[in-house]
UniProtKB/Swiss-Prot annotation:
The keyword Metal-binding applies. It comes from Brucella abortus (strain 2308). Homodimer. PANTHER family: CHAPERONE PROTEIN DNAJ, DNAJ HOMOLOG 1, MITOCHONDRIAL-RELATED. GO terms for biological process: chaperone cofactor-dependent protein refolding; DNA replication; protein refolding; response to heat. CXXCXGXG motif repeats lie at residues 148-155, 165-172, 187-194, 201-208. It comes from the Bacteria. It is found in: Cytoplasm. This is Chaperone protein DnaJ. The gene is dnaJ. Binds 2 Zn(2+) ions per monomer.
């Protein structure tokens, strides 16, 4: 019984090319013979989805199939130009390599003498808020793999050279028959390197790199925030057998500050003042990150939580000529451990107080009582 190509791929008859390709890719991953050895059913399904995609990916074949079904390709249908299955130049082998190549280790890629790019490295660094404000140049030591100086990264013992793998002729890939088509696989003779090192370097054991701690200078720009990432190109792990080095990524975090809290480019500082300063007015000085002392005037009658804005005294914005502000929040401290005389004076002050002195608290409780009595009626 002939299969329905759309059902085989699990798509509707209106599926576009992108949907067809995605469906084929997913099913090919699922039923590929390499993942299902000695499984005839998986092999059958794999052939079916390949046949279905081979037909539906071609606009002419798809139009013929939609109109005539499988009869379009039988007995010389459509002028005999399509044939049955995956015949013709390229065929399913090309489809498989283009769409599914990475599963087989890169499809049509060719080895570059076994050279491999080194891995990217991550380095976590903490900085103070002051350092984030002003920027700095930091020296760090990073344990990493560097190019072996004994063999200059070739992996071969000095005086010798790697030889080209005869199994893959230096490509690092070999073709293997898979039913009615062939696919590329990593060469088992050289593990994809394209070269064979018969006499490996004693220092790096044929890897072309050794582990060593390096000292690097890192420029920390002004205005960095938690999670800011700095990339040092080529400062990561050395490549294998002369391959390019990876990159080093510096991930920055800013330590909590004793006095300032940060919100983007703005800073916040809670300053305690006495009750009398809040009532009578006064002034105080705060230290800012630019190294200056800034005077803050407190008007009489200042309430708890009042904020004063110091423009331009916050954090610089990374890579911009913009600076945030510093907000001073007043925290009025209630007197404790009063002496007898202090208590007497406060009691006298309370007797002399009027509604004008405390407009918020005056009448608050009576209004609250009236409110809840009204609800109960």
């Amino acid at each position: 019984m002939k299969i329905d190509y759309y059902e085989a791929l699990g798509v509707t008859r209106t599926a576009d090319d992108k949907t067809l390709k995605a469906a084929f890719r997913k099913l090919a991953m699922q039923y590929h013979p390499d993942r299902n050895p000695d499984d005839p059913e998986a092999e059958r399904k794999f052939k079916e989805i390949g046949e279905a995609y081979e037909t539906l990916k071609d606009p002419q074949k798809r139009a013929a199939y939609d109109r005539f079904g499988h009869a379009a390709f039988e007995n010389g249908g459509m002028g005999g130009g399509f044939g049955n299955g995956f015949g013709g130049a390229g065929g399913f082998a090309d489809i498989f390599e283009d769409i599914f190549g990475e599963m087989m280790g890169g499809g049509r890629r060719r080895s570059n003498g076994g050279r491999e790019r080194g891995a990217d490295l991550r380095y976590n660094m903490e900085v103070t808020l002051e350092e984030a404000y002003a920027g700095k140049t930091a020296q760090i030591r990073v344990p990493t793999s560097i190019t072996c100086d004994e063999c200059s990264g070739s992996g071969a013992k000095p005086g010798s050279q790697p030889t080209t793998c005869t199994m893959c002729s230096g490509s690092g890939r070999v073709r293997a028959a898979q039913g009615f088509f062939s696919v590329e696989r990593t060469c088992p003779g050289c593990n994809g390197r394209g070269q064979i090192i018969k006499d490996p370097c004693e220092k790096c054991h044929g890897q072309g790199r050794v582990t060593q701690e390096r000292s690097l200078s890192v420029n920390i720009p002004t205005g960095i925030e938690d999670g800011t990432r700095i990339r040092l190109a080529g400062e990561g792990e050395a490549g294998l057998r002369g391959g390019p080095a990876g990159d080093l990524y510096i991930f920055l975090s800013v330590k909590p500050h004793e006095f300032f809290q940060r919100d983007g480019a703005d800073l916040y500082c809670k300053v305690p003042i006495s009750m009398t300063t809040a009532a009578l007015g006064g002034q105080f000085e705060v230290s800012t990150l630019d190294g200056t002392q800034t005077r803050v005037k407190v008007p009489e009658g200042t309430q708890n939580g009042k904020q004063f804005r110091l423009k331009g005294k916050g954090m610089p914005v990374l890579r911009q000529s913009v600076t945030g502000d510093l907000y001073i929040q007043i925290d009025i401290e209630t007197p404790q451990n009063l002496s007898k005389r202090q208590r007497e004076l406060l009691e006298e002050f309370e007797k002399l107080s009027s509604q004008e002195n405390s407009p918020k608290s005056a009448g608050f409780f009576s209004r609250m009582k009236e409110f809840f009595e009204g609800i109960g009626e």
